[in-house]
Amino acid sequence: MTAATAVSDTRVEELAALFVRFLETNTAPDGLFTDDVFLDLSLPQWRLQARGREEFVALRRRSHPCRGTVPRHRADPTPSGFVLEFEENWTDAQGTWYCRELMRADLRDGAIAEASVYCTGDWDPATRAAHAEKVRLLRP
């Protein structure tokens, strides 16, 4: 864990926007990650880790090879960084997929040094259709 330092709301919003761009393009913008960034990714029944910017990006590309969109996200500052809640949509040969995720990011020198990501798992088109048929959400 990194040492707690004050993080400005402006920097949190900048990093959240850079992270969303990363999710949508599978390319890490300059200034988003430290060179030795550590990722701890928890999936419904699996856990993966990566160290370093290149490994982080490679893990992302393996799990989400298609570019997508982030229709909604919210960032909240923490003493050591921020928490980002986000949703993703992407399309492949099977159709449009969906997932919801939560990331706790610790910063060092204004960049993400550690990230713990919790993912609902990827909902394929059939799961999305079944959910839409059986569940009425009060909020998107």
Predicted regions and their residues:
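Compositionally biased, low-structure terminal segments
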Residues: 20-23, 34, 57, 83, ...
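Short acidic-aromatic low-complexity motifs
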Residues: 5-35
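Alpha-helical structural motif
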Residues: 11, 15, 25, 52-55, ...
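Short, flexible active-site loop motifs that bind/organize anionic cofactors or intermediates
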Residues: 2, 19, 46
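Generic detector of well-ordered alpha-helical segments enriched in charged/polar residues
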Residues: 13-20, 30, 57, 128, ...
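Generic detector of low-complexity/intrinsically disordered segments
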Residues: 17-20, 41-43, 105, 109, ...
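A solvent-exposed, acidic/Ser-Thr-rich amphipathic alpha-helical stretch
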Residues: 27-79
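A beta-strand edge to alpha-helix "cap/lid" segment located at domain peripheries
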Residues: 2-7, 58-140
